């Protein structure tokens, strides 16, 4: 089943064709650590986490890089307002960020920080100067010459002339829409030495440098919130492809807005909800479920009712797991009846539908609807029939669901002793199905076991198994 993904560059869904076979290299823009994360950040990070989990479920090796911007105008301003050293600001809010990721069960492969890559950033800028794509102003700041990159605006659809950056630095630029690669030092600000004098990196150059450092000159997915399309990602693309002279990123992926009771989150409205407060009130599993109940490209509105609905739905899922586990513990008592076989076939089709939804631009909302159809079969059929095979299929469906959604980890840690007995019983039932020439179901069971790391070995009249 081909995975397809929406590419902001081109604005269409395209087949996922990776740079390297069965490997996905992904860079997601992380936070600027000057304040607490809000629930919008949480949505972005969880959405990309679900993508990573599904790709891994499908057998891809995923390398995920998510940066930490630890030097920026906002950090300097926060330090000046609070009277604290800028490094103290960075350390405090970095801990808040990493703690949120831990609670949300998000694991990042590489977490580069800007200040650890200053030398590489300087080298990147110098190469742009050498190629004629950047210039040094009298102040010692370095700017990207936007006119030197003809396809500027292709990603965002924004015309360069429409970009208003303010008047402070316009006089020293060739054009008002040129953007800073290196910012000359001002008294009281942190700085690093460079060929152009004391200063610090601009925002956009940081991500280009770090993504190439960890993922190479061409990688598969570059993502972030929809608000980053312009100017951040547009500028990243311009400077990176100007340097390389070729395509840099294959797929640009963006998570849509999160609103608060139909209003945009903003400090002026006083409606920003810190992520740590939401985690404390609702818990990570409810938040993850709620985030993923909507397609990542659809706007999501925060209100108490929607979180309560997510909590109740998650409780129903856990209750279904309890029923399934009880039926499995009872073991197989009889051959499946015709009605049971139909339930089994329905579950198999719903598992396929789950994968079809996830394969079509990671549609978690649609995928979730199929999981709830399986849950309805658990409550409406399996808890009364006590059919072992139906329960096993439902268990596998919910296991795959949880691998992607990450909302019921505590429900999926059986002991090795129990696991061995369950596999023995499943393999025996599969063997009986083979003897009855019910090959479609026996093949499905083999595939389920293989997906769980269990290899089935068939002989003429029996089957055995081992862990792969």
UniProtKB/Swiss-Prot annotation:
Cofactor entry: Zn(2+)
Highest taxon listed in the record's lineage: Archaea
Ligand binding (ATP): 267
Alphabetized UniProt keyword annotations: Aminoacyl-tRNA synthetase, ATP-binding, Cytoplasm, Ligase, Metal-binding, Nucleotide-binding, Protein biosynthesis, Zinc
Reactions that this protein is recorded to catalyse: tRNA(Cys) + L-cysteine + ATP = L-cysteinyl-tRNA(Cys) + AMP + diphosphate
Enzyme Commission (EC) number: 6.1.1.16
Keyword set includes Signal: no
Annotated coiled-coil segments of the chain: none
Family: Belongs to the class-I aminoacyl-tRNA synthetase family.
Record protein name field: Cysteine--tRNA ligase
Chain's gene name: cysS
């Amino acid at each position: 089943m081909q995975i397809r993904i929406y590419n902001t560059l081109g604005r269409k869904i395209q087949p996922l064709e990776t740079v390297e076979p069965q490997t996905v290299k992904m860079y997601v823009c992380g936070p600027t650590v000057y304040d607490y994360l809000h629930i919008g950040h949480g949505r972005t990070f969880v959405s990309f986490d679900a993508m990573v989990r599904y790709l891994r479920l499908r057998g891809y090796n995923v390398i995920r890089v998510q940066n930490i911007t630890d030097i920026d105008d906002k950090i300097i301003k926060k330090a000046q307002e609070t009277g604290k050293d800028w490094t103290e600001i960075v350390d405090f809010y970095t801990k808040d960020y990493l703690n949120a990721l831990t609670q949300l069960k998000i694991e990042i492969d590489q977490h580069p920080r800007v200040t650890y890559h200053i030398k590489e950033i300087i080298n990147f800028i110098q190469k742009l100067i050498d190629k004629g794509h950047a210039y040094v102003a009298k102040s010692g700041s370095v700017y990207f010459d936007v006119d030197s990159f003809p396809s500027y605006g292709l990603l965002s659809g924004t015309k360069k002339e429409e970009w208003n950056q303010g008047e402070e630095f316009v006089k020293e630029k060739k054009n008002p829409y040129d953007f800073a690669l290196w910012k000359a030092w001002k008294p009281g600000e942190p700085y690093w030495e460079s060929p152009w004098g004391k200063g610090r990196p601009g925002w956009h150059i940081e991500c280009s440098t770090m993504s190439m450092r960890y993922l190479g000159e061409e990688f598969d997915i570059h993502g972030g919130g929809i608000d980053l399309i312009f100017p951040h990602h547009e500028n990243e693309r311009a400077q990176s492809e100007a340097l390389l002279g070729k395509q840099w990123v294959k797929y640009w992926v963006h998570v849509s807005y999160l609103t608060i009771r139909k209003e945009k989150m903003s400090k002026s409205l006083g409606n920003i909800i810190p992520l740590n407060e939401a985690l404390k009130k609702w818990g990570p599993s409810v938040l993850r479920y709620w985030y993923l109940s909507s397609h990542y490209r659809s706007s999501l509105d925060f209100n108490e009712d929607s979180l309560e609905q997510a909590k109740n739905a998650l409780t129903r899922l856990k209750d279904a797991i309890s029923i399934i586990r009880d039926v499995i513990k009872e073991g197989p008592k009889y051959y499946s009846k015709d009605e049971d076989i139909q339930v089994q076939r329905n579950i198999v089709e719903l598992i396929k539908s789950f994968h079809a939804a996830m394969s079509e631009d990671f549609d978690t909302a649609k995928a979730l609807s199929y999981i709830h159809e399986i849950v309805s079969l658990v409550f409406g059929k399996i808890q009364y029939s006590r059919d072992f095979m139906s329960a096993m299929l439902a268990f596998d469906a919910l296991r795959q669901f949880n691998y992607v959604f990450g909302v019921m980890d505590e429900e999926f840690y059986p002991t090795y002793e129990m696991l061995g007995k369950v596999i023995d019983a499943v393999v025996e039932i599969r063997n009986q199905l083979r003897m009855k020439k019910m090959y479609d179901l026996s093949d499905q069971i083999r595939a389920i076991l293989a997906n769980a790391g269990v290899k089935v070995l068939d002989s003429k009249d029996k089957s055995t198994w081992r862990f792969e």
